[in-house]
Amino acid sequence: MGGGRVAHPVLKGPSVVKELVIGTVLGLAAGGLWKMHHWNEQRKTRAFYDLLEKGEISVVVDEE
C-alpha cells in the first residue's frame, strides 16, 4: 500500500484587479444606500416644513 496523493489547490496571492473591482462595487453599493437614506430624510424634512408653513401643524403647545 502506497501513500495516496491528494491534489492540493495551489494558493496564489491576492489579485489586485479583483480587489479593486470588489472594493469599487461595495463602495458604490454602500454610497447608494447612504444617498437613498439622505434623500428619504430630506423628503421627510421638506414635508414637515411644508405642513408647518401651511399651518396644518404647529410646534407650539396650545395652552388651555
From Swiss-Prot:
One cellular component term from this protein's GO annotations in UniProt: mitochondrial inner membrane
Transmembrane stretches, start-end: 15-34
Cell location: Mitochondrion inner membrane
Keywords, alphabetical: Membrane, Mitochondrion, Mitochondrion inner membrane, Transmembrane, Transmembrane helix
Function of the molecule: This protein is one of the nuclear-coded polypeptide chains of cytochrome c oxidase, the terminal oxidase in mitochondrial electron transport.
PANTHER family the UniProt entry points to: CYTOCHROME C OXIDASE SUBUNIT 5C-2-RELATED
Entry's family note: Belongs to the cytochrome c oxidase subunit 5C family.
Protein name as annotated: Cytochrome c oxidase subunit 5C-2
Organism: Helianthus annuus (Common sunflower)
Lineage start: Eukaryota, Viridiplantae, Streptophyta, Embryophyta, Tracheophyta
Gene: COX5C2
